[in-house]
């Protein structure tokens, strides 16, 4: 390429990358985002003929001025700060606005007001201007931290970076994050409610398979990036990307309590809401009162289905008043996310790993759910076909 790739999105691009724009990245790791930001502003300065460019030295002078006046970067580690500096100015001596925040996640989570003051002080110290307005905040925040729970237990933190960016009050925010917040995610209920009710989110670009965005990363549920515009108030333009296919529709985010990622599914959801829900025949969790670690014997009157296989229990092990015991029913595994939540070769997701019809005197542990229940095997077979 004779020059780097440049993407123009009209008014937003013109505003964000104006010659006098100030852009902040939170959590730079390699400096690639600041590099693109610096190039875009450099391009705007040259295009607007603010500087005469007749030599490599002139180009270098303009570049250094952009990095010194327009780009501000916060890093989570000293190494990230060093790499970002090298990306922007190489090994030369030039002014660069980078700062390493020790324990960045903890500061944003537990001391947000203090963090905002420190960011303001950092920018004031570098520019000599108090309360400078940041035009845009961008970034690829950390996605999660281990929370010390049983087994592999991680808590999302990317939501904290979106929230702190809004508190800093720029004109624009654009960050990329996992798409799990659309409908789930540990501790993300209030964040999801806040996002879906925020009319300032003008665009969401949703990659159903994260590998379409990050080819070497496995991120269950995909990733998305947003454009938040302080001056926008309206429906959101939602683009869903699946391989080479793109589907775009403008619609409100707060139609439902969760975000429906597929535009084509909206009318289906509306139609289904007018009918009886399948949830009405899904039984409560652990209907037989058997924990997931229980294992039976080699013989008995009741067949026990566990994640380890088939065993047997005496009839006295189950409450005789349990209405499910004497009926046909559907055994179903709890929702899973096999292959790290990524689609298979056919682009399909495996959501339920096991479903089967079980009969009278068949029970299961808490590893499974029970759907439907009838003395008629035909009724249960029809319910099974629906699943």
Specify the residue positions occupied by each region the protein language model found.
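SAM-dependent methyltransferase catalytic region
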Residues: 1-204, 209-213, 222, 226-238
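C-terminal substrate-recognition regions of SAM-dependent nucleic acid methyltransferases
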Residues: 209-387
């Amino acid at each position: 390429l004779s020059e780097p790739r440049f993407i123009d999105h009209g008014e937003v691009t013109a505003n964000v990358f104006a010659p006098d724009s100030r852009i902040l990245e939170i959590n730079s790791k390699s400096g690639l985002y600041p590099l693109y930001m610096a190039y875009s502003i450099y391009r705007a300065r040259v295009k607007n003929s603010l500087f005469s460019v007749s030599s490599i030295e002139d180009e270098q002078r303009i570049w250094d001025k952009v990095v010194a006046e327009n780009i501000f970067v916060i890093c989570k580690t000293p190494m990230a700060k060093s790499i970002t500096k090298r990306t922007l100015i190489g090994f030369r001596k030039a002014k660069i606005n980078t700062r390493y925040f020790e324990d960045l996640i903890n500061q944003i989570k537990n001391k947000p007001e203090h963090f905002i003051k420190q960011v303001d002080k950092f920018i004031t110290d570098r520019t000599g201007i108090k309360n400078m307005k940041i035009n845009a905040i961008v970034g690829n925040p950390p996605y999660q931290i281990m929370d010390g729970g049983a087994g592999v237990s991680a808590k999302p933190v990317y939501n904290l970076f979106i929230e702190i960016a809004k508190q800093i009050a720029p004109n624009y925010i654009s960050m990329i994050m996992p798409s799990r917040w659309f409908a789930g995610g540990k501790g993300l209920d209030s964040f999801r409610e806040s996002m879906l009710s925020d009319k300032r989110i003008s665009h969401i670009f949703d990659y159903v398979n994260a590998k379409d965005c990050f080819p070497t990363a496995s991120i269950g549920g995909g990733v998305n990036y947003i454009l938040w515009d302080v001056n926008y108030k309206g429906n959101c333009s939602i683009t869903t990307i699946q391989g080479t296919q793109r589907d775009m529709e403008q619609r409100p985010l707060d139609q439902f309590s969760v975000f429906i990622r597929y535009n084509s599914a909206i009318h289906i959801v509306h139609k289904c809401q007018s009918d009886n829900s399948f949830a009405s025949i899904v039984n409560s969790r652990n209907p037989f009162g058997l924990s997931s670690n229980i294992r039976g014997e080699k013989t008995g009157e009741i067949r026990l289905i566990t994640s380890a296989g088939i065993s047997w229990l005496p009839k006295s092990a189950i409450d005789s008043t349990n209405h499910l015991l004497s009926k046909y029913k559907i055994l179903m595994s709890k929702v899973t996310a096999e292959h790290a939540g990524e689609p298979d070769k056919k682009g399909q997701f495996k959501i339920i790993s096991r479903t089967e019809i079980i009969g009278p005197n068949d029970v299961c542990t808490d590893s499974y759910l029970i759907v439907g229940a009838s003395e008629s095997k035909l009724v249960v077979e029809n319910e099974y076909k629906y699943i």
